[in-house]
UniProtKB/Swiss-Prot annotation:
SUPFAM superfamilies: alpha-helical ferredoxin (SSF46548). It comes from Methanococcus maripaludis (strain DSM 14266 / JCM 13030 / NBRC 101832 / S2 / LL). PANTHER family: IRON-SULFUR-BINDING OXIDOREDUCTASE FADF-RELATED, IRON-SULFUR-BINDING OXIDOREDUCTASE FADF-RELATED-RELATED. The heterodisulfide reductase is composed of three subunits; HdrA, HdrB and HdrC. B1 and B2 subunits are interchangeable, as are the C1 and C2 subunits. The heterodisulfide reductase forms a supercomplex with formylmethanofuran dehydrogenase (Fwd), F(420)-non-reducing hydrogenase (Vhu) and formate dehydrogenase (Fdh). Pathway: Cofactor metabolism; coenzyme M-coenzyme B heterodisulfide reduction; coenzyme B and coenzyme M from coenzyme M-coenzyme B heterodisulfide: step 1/1. This is H(2)/formate:CoB-CoM heterodisulfide,ferredoxin reductase subunit C2. One of its GO terms (cellular component) is plasma membrane. GO terms for biological process: methanogenesis. Binds 2 [4Fe-4S] cluster. Keywords: 4Fe-4S, Iron, Iron-sulfur, Metal-binding, Methanogenesis, Oxidoreductase.
Amino acid sequence: MMKAEELNKGFVNEIIEAGTPVPGEKEVASLKSCYQCGTCTGSCPSGRRTAYRTRKVIRQALLGIDSVLDSDDIWKCTTCYTCYERCPRDVKVTEIIKTIRNLAAQKGNMAKPHKMTAVYVLKAGHAVPANDDTAKLRKSIGLAEKAPIAQFSQKDMDELRTLAKNLKFDELIGFDWKTMGLKQ
């Protein structure tokens, strides 16, 4: 059981401050309107198949339990926005979860599948890069092996990689430029 002195009394305000530039203060400040009815959890497709409970994440944030930033649960949200649409208090749950994820990532906590998506973008310019199987399938149905919009030009890739380096996104995800993968 947690003790009162272990709670971060300013955590809600940290979340609101972090979310003020994007998605916006109003959206993230809606966190304070949550009265824990559970509509978000009952609506959540991830919650039906995993131990993920949206309401629990929101409750931890409201109580100042900043260890939520270390939790794998925050990465189980699919950002489908069902909770967002169904909340009777108009709490922008998905935007709050994304803001909490951003805080966790800044702290160095990010789910490996999310890091791998970023790796694919830095390697190929696309979160789901074309591979040999995709090329064969496209060819078998009479399409060009490479979709013209699915891959970036070398100039575009250079700009993307420069941007990632300048913003230290590569460091955030632990990207190794030599292996073009995650650092071991």
